[in-house]
Amino acid sequence: GLYHQKYDYPPETILSHTFWEERPEEFYRFYRDKLIVKGAKPNAAHLRLAKLEREGRLKAVITQNIDGLHQAAGSKTVYELHGSTLRNYCVKCGAFYDVDFIANSTGVPRCPGCGGIIKPDVVLYEEGLDEQVLSGAVSAIRRADTLIIGGTSLVVYPAAGLIRYFRGDHLVVINMQPTNADAEADLCIAKPIGQVLSEDVVVEE
């Protein structure tokens, strides 16, 4: 498809730790082209979730997205399972660089301070999830009385396995396609999550 027209490898190969180490030029070309989303703005779903948090009705957002749009919408407690393109660090000295630094760099981005390679704070294939983020997400799910799963078919692990920690009363699934959680859910809505959350849904306490 689209990837093979421009790149010699499938995205799963390019976005692996091994590829980042062995072919960094190619990795960063793909990364700038496909993973950095310029000018993206929070949608109605992002804004609604942030509003629910401000109202004290939502405790946390757990996301597989790496675009930082939940925070841009105003959400405070966000567990980014796969990291974020907005954070980048020098592998040598640990200096922080924003997404614009990577977007505007050419070739392999290097730290002006020490010359080390700047690596995105994104979980690549072959890398484990951040333990603190994972334990925070598990803790939030364990404490929740309602869990809303939206916009994911629950096939990517370990994220898909987090549902097993839920002990609450109400499991809601909002997804266009069937998911592995549908059988256990109290409510399944086969619509795009952006559409559902932008509608005026009344939630009884």
Identify the residue ranges that each predicted region occupies.
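Conserved catalytic core of sirtuin-type NAD+-dependent deacylases
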Residues: 1-205
